[in-house]
Amino acid sequence: MQISIFAVGRMKSGAEQKLVQHYLDRFSKSSGAVGFHLKKLQEIPESRAQTACQRMEEEGRKLIEFLPEKCQLIVLDERGESISSAAFAEKLGCYRDEGIRDVIIALGGPDGHNEQIRNRADFLLSFGFMTWPHQIARILLTEQLYRAVTIANHHPYHRF
């Protein structure tokens, strides 16, 4: 199963970008054993429209353009469900076992996702009630992807 991250905005060079790459590298080295593969991290340009509504619409259109025809779409959204790391690993494992080929995980821009993206989502995921800067949300996501692989591999990184 191929997993891609579609993120609105560019990750600037620095410690955050290095940490994202660190977790993506660890994920890639460990994920093949459980049938997960990192396909790509697709950055979608942040809209420069004047209103939040216009920005979300423009970013949503761009995101839809990049989506494969058949994919499972997980959208990070404050309205989403907060689940445990083990439940996230189980969800990914279920997608794999169901023969899902492509899983896309979408991170919105500063204004979030529009209703069209939320409605298209197969699962809305939340990292809790707090608001996270985009860079930290990417770090959290990549760490959780790596953690999901370690859970599936029964690796001690995730303490059971």
From Swiss-Prot:
Single GO MF annotation: rRNA (pseudouridine-N3-)-methyltransferase activity
One GO CC term on file: cytoplasm
Enzyme class: transferase
Predominant localisation class: cytoplasm
InterPro entries for the chain: Alpha/beta_knot_MTases, RlmH-like, tRNA_m1G_MTases_N
Catalytic activity, as annotated: pseudouridine(1915) in 23S rRNA + S-adenosyl-L-methionine = N(3)-methylpseudouridine(1915) in 23S rRNA + S-adenosyl-L-homocysteine + H(+)
Gene3D superfamilies per the UniProt record, alphabetical: 3.40.1280.10
Localization of this protein: Cytoplasm
Residues the entry annotates as binding S-adenosyl-L-methionine: L76, G108, F127, G128, F129, M130, T131, W132
Keywords: Cytoplasm, Methyltransferase, rRNA processing, S-adenosyl-L-methionine, Transferase
Pfam families: SPOUT_MTase
Documented EC number(s): 2.1.1.177
Protein family per UniProt: Belongs to the RNA methyltransferase RlmH family.
Oligomeric form and interacting partners: Homodimer.
HAMAP family recorded: 23SrRNA_methyltr_H (MF_00658)
Protein purpose: Specifically methylates the pseudouridine at position 1915 (m3Psi1915) in 23S rRNA.
PANTHER family: METHYLTRANSFERASE (PTHR33603), RIBOSOMAL RNA LARGE SUBUNIT METHYLTRANSFERASE H (PTHR33603:SF1)
Protein name: Ribosomal RNA large subunit methyltransferase H
Protein encoded by which gene: rlmH
